[in-house]
């Protein structure tokens, strides 16, 4: 396998067709890296040391790769596989929101939908565990969606630090976002950040706590959210 320095040098001499082939190769190398290496603390396979990618290159990689990656100001990070408790909580929240918003122009997405936005001039692309968007798709592929209103991240051991710090700060830069919620699958812990309250965290830890999602007019009990979680 060629070094990344060699690949980057060669890219300057390539035609459009050759560049597309190169992006395929980059995608394959990203996939190989994320399969072989253990996820570092905070992210499932940080690839920042390789090189900086344009947003267009990243999107092309995502279209070709069976693995998902997040994009932060030119850096690409492979995403790890969620654990059972994480998946159960995310599915429960998404199902409740989808049922509640039936017939409403806002849409609920769970895990597989990219959320792209600008943060202090940089492009960011995340895959929130659950989010509600109330705008229109930006392109034919549907990668982007305008006006996210609610974002929910379910914490995992490998992503908790990133979710609490980096993402909590970056999501605030989305003008349409009204609420950002962090959910710890074990033990019961819900943290709500609302724009209307200057993003000050509200922490709920009681087993009978009620999560009030004001941005979409839905209230869920902790019992509902954590149902079936071992």
Predicted regions and their residues:
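Gly/Pro/Ser/Thr-rich low-complexity, intrinsically disordered segments predominantly at protein N-termini
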Residues: 2-10, 17-230
């Amino acid at each position: 396998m060629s070094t990344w320095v060699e690949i980057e040098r060669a890219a300057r001499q390539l035609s459009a067709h050759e560049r597309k082939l190169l992006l395929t190769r980059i995608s394959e190398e990203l996939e190989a890296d994320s399969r072989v290496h253990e996820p570092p603390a905070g992210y499932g396979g940080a690839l920042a040391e390789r090189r900086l990618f344009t947003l267009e290159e990243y999107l092309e990689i995502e279209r070709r790769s069976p693995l998902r990656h997040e994009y932060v100001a030119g850096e690409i990070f492979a995403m790890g596989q969620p654990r059972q408790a994480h998946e159960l909580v995310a599915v429960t929240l998404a199902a409740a929101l989808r049922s509640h918003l039936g017939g409403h122009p806002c849409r609920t997405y769970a895990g597989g939908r990219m959320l792209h936005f600008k943060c202090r001039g940089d492009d960011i692309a995340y895959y929130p565990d659950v989010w509600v968007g109330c705008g229109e798709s930006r392109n034919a592929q549907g990668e982007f969606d305008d006006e996210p209103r609610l974002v929910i991240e379910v914490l995992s051991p490998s992503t908790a630090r990133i979710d609490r710090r980096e993402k909590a700060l970056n999501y605030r830069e989305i003008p349409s976002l009204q609420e950002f919620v962090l959910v710890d699958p074990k033990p019961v812990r819900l943290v709500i950040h609302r724009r209307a309250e200057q993003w000050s965290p509200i922490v709920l830890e009681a087993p009978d706590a009620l999560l009030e999602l004001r941005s979409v007019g839905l209230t869920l009990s902790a019992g509902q959210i954590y149902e079936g979680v071992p």
